[in-house]
Amino acid sequence: FLGLANKGNYTIVASVNGDTGDMLEFQYRHLLKKLGFETDFRTLDGKSYIGVVSGGKAVFEKTGDEQLTENLSLYGGKISVTITSGGAVTGQPVARIIADGKEYAPNGSGINFAVFDNKLQKIVAAQSYDTSVYTYTYKGTDAFYGEILIEE
């Protein structure tokens, strides 16, 4: 999913629910770096995390011991995004990615992603990965626009 997202012209929003886990293998850490995320997810130790990357570069990243909420805009204000992360240390694990008033994050344990197509300037997919286990189980990919197909 993320490997394919890396091959296109996408903006990726990430929010952590609970813990990213220290089981994140090198190949996945490397892929996240290639996508533009600068934070080493293994070192979060249950902290909250919000990140936005576009074109292989970090646009916004924030970590904290408290629940985080950020209101950001994409595409020159065309899309309003509210991102919430509750790491394990907050006692309130949650991941929310709301674009123009609609919830897109699967709110699964681990790292939640929402992918926006930069050409269409619309959300195209969302998925969460439970990185606290080696199988990296994911909640099914939600694709929002049929003309854009991101498959595993």
Regions found by a protein language model. Give the residues of each.
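Short acidic-hydrophobic catalytic motif
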Residues: 1-152
